[in-house]
UniProtKB/Swiss-Prot annotation:
<protein>
    <recommendedName>
        <fullName>U3-agatoxin-Ao1k</fullName>
    </recommendedName>
</protein>
<feature type="disulfide bond">
    <location>
        <begin position="59"/>
        <end position="65"/>
    </location>
</feature>
<comment type="function">
    <text>Insecticidal neurotoxin that modulates the insect Nav channel (DmNaV1/tipE (para/tipE)) in a unique manner, with both the activation and inactivation processes being affected. The voltage dependence of activation is shifted toward more hyperpolarized potentials (analogous to site 4 toxins) and a non-inactivating persistent sodium current is induced (site 3-like action). Interestingly, both effects take place in a voltage-dependent manner, producing a bell-shaped curve between -80 and 0 mV.</text>
</comment>
<keyword id="KW-0738">Voltage-gated sodium channel impairing toxin</keyword>
<dbReference type="GO" id="GO:0090729">
    <property type="term" value="F:toxin activity"/>
</dbReference>
<comment type="similarity">
    <text>Belongs to the neurotoxin 07 (Beta/delta-agtx) family. 03 (aga-4) subfamily. Aga sub-subfamily.</text>
</comment>
<feature type="disulfide bond">
    <location>
        <begin position="51"/>
        <end position="67"/>
    </location>
</feature>
<dbReference type="Pfam" id="PF05980">
    <property type="entry name" value="Toxin_7"/>
</dbReference>
<keyword id="KW-0528">Neurotoxin</keyword>
<feature type="disulfide bond">
    <location>
        <begin position="36"/>
        <end position="52"/>
    </location>
</feature>
<keyword id="KW-0732">Signal</keyword>
<feature type="disulfide bond">
    <location>
        <begin position="43"/>
        <end position="57"/>
    </location>
</feature>
<keyword id="KW-0960">Knottin</keyword>
<feature type="signal peptide">
    <location>
        <begin position="1"/>
        <end position="20"/>
    </location>
</feature>
<keyword id="KW-0872">Ion channel impairing toxin</keyword>
<dbReference type="GO" id="GO:0005576">
    <property type="term" value="C:extracellular region"/>
</dbReference>
<dbReference type="GO" id="GO:0017080">
    <property type="term" value="F:sodium channel regulator activity"/>
</dbReference>
């Protein structure tokens, strides 16, 4: 009986550690995207708001620079 309880406690501790690590990695990924804007939103490559990953800032109609979807070229 003690063995079963010990195994359950050990597996619960392992699960808690794994969840804590995955949560920390998720928060680090989110911090990199903080303050970014999406498609057709106003951006500024040199300062201020930047485009989220998968988009790039184009200033075709300066001074209104906007984020466009990155085609992967």
């Amino acid at each position: 009986m003690r063995t079963i309880i010990s195994l359950l406690l050990l597996s619960a501790m392992v699960f808690a550690v794994i969840e804590a690590i995955s949560l920390e990695e998720g928060l680090q990924l989110f911090e990199g995207e903080r303050g970014c804007v999406g498609e057709n939103q106003q951006c500024a490559d040199w300062a201020g708001l930047h485009c989220c990953s998968g988009y790039y800032c184009t200033c075709r109609y300066f001074p209104k620079c906007i984020c466009r979807k990155d085609s992967g070229k």
